[in-house]
Design a protein with these regions (language model features):
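Intracellular alpha-helical coupling/juxtamembrane segments of multi-pass membrane proteins
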Residues: 251-276, 280-300, 304-306
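ABC ATP-binding cassette signature C-motif
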Residues: 1-263, 311-312, 316-577
Length: 577
């Protein structure tokens, strides 16, 4: 479908990657991985035809359509949600308009026996059959399925897109892209603005899709569930594995060990050669051999080793005083903005040492309850913070509180105490501030970089109760592993607001579900909760489809039927008639 040959991209004089070649085939589900700045988003832009490589060729098979979802895009505010989603079916509307004109012409004409009239009937029949095959009569149902799958309520369909946040408008763009059903989908961080239910829906959609998918994501569970091939960009090269991400991690570790052995052998060879040259440089009897060794040394191509895997780095929180038995107790807590009730009658008790997750669709009040606990906003009811509780709070706006005039290294050096100061550079590297990045001033950092720095700073402060609101948003998978292990070893209490299943798995032992103005407690881990939710949804479906009330459901044609060839569909229609 797409062939990439000899690709090279340079920024200034430094190549981002070079001599990159691979092929994207139908049904490929490719995870494009690598550290931040390796060139993943650049690769997607090149595949989408939005950026030209310095060298090389991207050949797209004739007739192949490509759909691209960037991390950031310009969004329209002039239409309703439904009208915006309908833009994916412009070709249907064009066909509909054409059919209406042809139909009107047939109605106006009276030369029923003429050859041109019969030709018009044939053209109309042909176009009408194409229109039906392309979903001309059921496109609206497809839009509704996609929008609800991505978390919209039916009451949202007629609301203007300007009423929605940037994250929700990105969902509309994703819906339009999926509805167009391109042959190749290029997705850059598609789960960034999705909740768990929407992520699971997207997973199922992509797995059922007949085209190819190339995606960049830091959601490990998502890429494991969707992909069957992993392409890593590392040290300016690519490594192509025909396996899902978890298996790739194992193979990558083996590859790095082999590289390390080869590197050590090469270094020994270089040292031995240099020693020989130095020892016999001024001996006339060895002149030929010395010159030979010098040429040999010049021909050696240095072996590069992949970036060090920082996931084995262990962080330990500094000691803090022991808190009371119940760090947080909520009694009949309610929060409303005017007539809009976010939640009501919230009753929960979090015990010392518990690690709990707040989950639910966006806008259901997870971050709002966190702000109530932090006493940042007023609320109704009673909310008690326990004895000796020292809260460490992370939210995206915490990054704004950093001192802009100091470096990344100094920001962390100011809070680090004891032996941990010897590991500052390792810690910074684990959170993608390796090398020269640690000497950058805070004021030149991007929003995502500032968030990561605020997270590191929090990890080194002595607290006994952590509240983390979307802590993994700007972390790569290795950074998330480091953070997760640190939290697992933390002996205090933790509340995590997150949609990242892989991050929550094995970390939390209780889940609070936000939805419909209520907060429900579920004992167990995130996958226990999701399994229970799946069963509840099935039970609700069975109840709503009980024999007494269920109406017979018209079976929808399978996707493969809707994509039959024109002649085959024509024959099928004859048989039906």
């Amino acid at each position: 479908m797409i062939s990439i040959e000899g690709l090279k991209v340079e920024f200034g004089t430094t190549p981002l990657f070079e001599d990159v070649s691979f092929v994207i085939n139908k049904k490929d589900r490719i995870a494009l991985v690598g550290k931040n700045g390796a060139g993943k988003s650049t690769m997607l832009k090149i595949l989408a035809g939005l950026q030209q490589p310095t060298e090389g060729v991207v050949a797209v098979q004739r007739g192949i359509t490509i759909g691209y979802l960037p991390q950031v895009m310009i969004l329209s505010d002039t239409r309703t949600v439904m009208a915006e989603a309908e833009m994916a079916f412009e070709h249907i509307f064009e066909m509909q308009e054409k059919l209406e004109k042809m139909n009107q012409e047939l109605a106006d004409r009276t030369d029923y026996d003429s050859e041109s009239y019969h030709e018009l009937i044939e053209r109309f029949t042909h176009e009408n059959e194409r229109f039906l095959m392309m979903g001309g009569t059921n496109y609206r149902a497809e839009i509704e399925r996609t929008l609800t799958g991505l978390g919209f309520n039916r009451t949202d369909f007629d609301r203007p897109t300007s009423e929605f946040s940037g994250g929700w408008r990105m969902r509309i763009e994703l819906a339009k892209l999926l509805l167009r059903r391109p042959d190749v989908l290029l997705l850059d961080e598609p789960t960034n603005h999705l909740d768990i239910e929407s992520i699971q829906w997207l997973e199922n959609f992509l797995k059922m899709s007949s085209g190819a998918v190339v995606l960049v994501s830091h959601d490990r569970a998502f890429i494991n569930n969707v992909t069957n091939r992993t392409i890593e960009i590392s040290c300016g090269r690519i490594y192509d594995y025909k396996v899902a991400y978890d298996e790739f991690v194992v193979l990558r570790k083996e590859r790095r060990e082999q590289q390390l052995r080869a590197y050590e052998n090469q270094q020994k060879e270089i040292k031995d050669t240099e020693d020989f040259i130095e020892r016999f440089r001024y001996k006339a009897t060895k002149a030929v051999q010395v010159q030979s060794r010098i040429k040999q040394l010049e021909k050696i191509v240095p072996i590069e080793i992949d970036e060090e895997d920082t996931s084995t780095l262990r962080l330990k929180f500094p000691p803090s005083m022991r808190s009371g038995n119940y760090p947080v107790i909520c009694e009949n807590v309610k929060k409303a903005y005017g007539d809009h009730v976010v939640f009501h009658d919230v009753n929960l008790t979090i015990h010392r040492g518990e690690k709990v997750a707040f989950v639910g669709k966006n806008g259901e009040g997870k971050s709002t309850l966190v702000k109530c606990i932090m006493d940042e906003i007023p609320y109704e009811g009673k909310l008690t913070i326990g004895h000796n509780v020292q809260i460490g709070y992370f939210a995206q706006n915490q990054a704004q509180l950093l001192d802009e005039n100091v470096t990344v290294f100094d920001t962390i050096d100011r809070v680090a105490k004891g032996d941990i100061r010897l590991k500052i550079r390792d810690i910074l590297g684990a959170f993608m501030f390796g090398g020269e990045a640690s000497e950058k001033k805070v004021k030149v950092l991007s929003g995502g970089e500032r968030s990561r720095l605020a997270m590191i700073k929090l990890l080194l402060e002595p607290v006994n109760f952590l509240i983390l609101d979307e802590p993994t948003n700007h972390l790569d998978m290795r950074s998330k592993d480091v953070l997760k292990e640190a939290l697992k070893e933390f002996d205090g209490t933790v509340i995590v607001v997150s949609h990242d299943r892989e991050f929550l798995d094995g970390l939390v032992t209780k889940v609070y579900e936000f939805g419909g103005g209520l907060v429900k407690e579920h004992i167990g881990g995130i996958y226990d909760f999701l399994q229970k939710k799946k069963m509840e949804n099935l039970n609700e479906l069975q109840l709503s489809q009980s024999p007494q009330t269920a109406s017979p459901k018209k079976e929808e044609p399978a996707e493969s039927e809707s994509k039959l060839s024109y002649e085959a569909q024509k024959e099928l229609n004859k048989k039906i008639r």
